[in-house]
Amino acid sequence: FDENARFLEGTYVVGVLAKAFLDKNPAEAIVYDPRNILNTESVIAAAGGKATISKSGHSFIKQVMRENNAVYGGEMSAHHYFRDFNYCDSGMIPWLLVIELLSKSGKTEAPKKLSQLVDEMIAAFPISGEINFKLDGITAPAVLAKLEESYPQFDNQTATLDKLDGLSVNFP
């Protein structure tokens, strides 16, 4: 939540923390799950870091972090992992880092509020949040197969499919 009691989706918190880590550790790897893709990749690229995607889940995130010596890993579900904390999840470290980031923001400019740090991200990369459906009369694999068959035909056949963690369709 920000100072206005507005709930912040995990993707924006991961973006804020990725920027904080890359400010201190330029060019380091940041690991994130596929639900965080657009905002997180943008923040990491702008800060000069190495964007590294992983399947969702702590065991996958930690493994990819170790393989890439990543300084930080974040999930949409608000789980945050830290190299300097033996790749463990912590709920306390993120809010301490956000407080540190906010306190440093006033050193060379007017102090920023958390809402100001995320407003630009929200405007650039709005998200719906997770949407779940109950399927009646059809199986999830059948739906995924139909989507996999159909989506590449859109946008002049420029869509690409990613099956890292479920099915993602990327449009250029």
Where do the language-model regions lie?
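Short Gly/Thr/Asp-enriched flexible loops that form oxyanion-binding sites at enzyme active sites
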Residues: F1-Y12, T40-E41
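Phosphate-binding and adjacent anionic-ligand microenvironments
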Residues: N25-P172
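Extended, compositionally biased non-globular segments that define protein topology
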Residues: V14-V16
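A short, N-terminal amphipathic alpha-helix
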Residues: K19-D23
